[in-house]
Amino acid sequence: MKVHEYQAKEILRRYGVPTPRGIVVDNSEEARRAATELGGRVVVKAQIHAGGRGKGGGVKLAKDADEAAELTQKMLGMTLITHQTGPEGRVVGKVLIEEALNIDKELYLGITLDRRLGMNVIMASAQGGMDIEEVAERDPNAIHREPVDGVLGVQPFQARQVAYALGLEGDAFKKCVDFVQKLMRAYIETDAALAEINPLLVTKEGDVLALDCKMSFDDNAMFRHKDVMAMRDFNEEDPLEVEASKFGLNYIKLDGNVGCMVNGAGLAMATMDIAKLAGGEPANFLDVGGGASAEQVKNAFRIILSDKNVKAILINIFGGIMRGDRIAEGVVSASREVGLPVPVVVRLEGTNVELGKEILAKSGLPLITADGMWDAAQKVVAAAKGHQ
């Protein structure tokens, strides 16, 4: 789960992580009052769940309260397009008015899980204020990585290593060490999946602050954090993904035209790969799980069909806990309820597979059956091309 910049900073402040003073607004008059309260010279920042806002025109410097109000009026309601939003962009509903600071250095600091190491890793670079992916590609050695033991936590010497890597000294060095330790505590205690400070700002006065902050959280841990869960902004999420989550379905919308319904994340990814190999483009990732009911299958079917880009659907089920007859009943029920506006290819294997195939055969529906994954992939790609 993602949160907005102003929400991430609110979380960080609870842990003593320094951030600039800021006020979130949703109209120009509030922006005028906020800018006046913050001293007049402020930064106006569009709040969307995506990076690259500056390049897209979503971050502007205002010299006084009147200009802040004018910029806010222009930003609110605009569709902001960045390299992370895709061509459809995101509509701006809130704006953060933040005090302007005297910048000396812009650095990068981030914490995330390194699955290869099985440890959280602190990443730091003196090349802040830009996409860290670009830095990693251009100059991998410019990023310092500090793995953190899950039991011991971040040690003082590790925080000092990070400050050294950022080239800091004097008061800024000491403040950075404190910043790193507090950021790690915030990351761990909120079950975050990412805490990214870009840029980490060093002011001319020697202060160290989070000028921008991006945080995301482990969905499976949110039952422990009702306060963070309350920050969820459904307007920033794909409506189909929100709908799927209500039924316990793991759904991620993609840009292709081959809808996929699969049980198990590994098989779902393999199904997407083989559809791509056969010349198709997956329209989604959808894992119905190991114990889905016929009702869940029906809802999964309906959600896939809600995507107007879908030209054919591949249902690929290996029955272990999930029985083939239950899937078949769900497919038949969903097909009769919503109709079959696109071709549907079904591949069943495992528990009760023969019973499942029998249910499909007796349904009288124009379902296309397949004997293996490659056969299914070829059939669904051909069906999608024929249904353009």
What are these regions (language model features)?
Residues 320:
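Catalytic core of bacterial c-di-GMP phosphodiesterases, primarily the EAL and HD-GYP domains
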Residues 341-350:
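Short internal beta-strands
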Residues 1-197, 201-315, 325-327, 336, ...:
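ATP-dependent carboxylate/acyl-activation modules
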Residues 332-333:
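Short amphipathic alpha-helix used as the core "switch/output" element in two-component signaling
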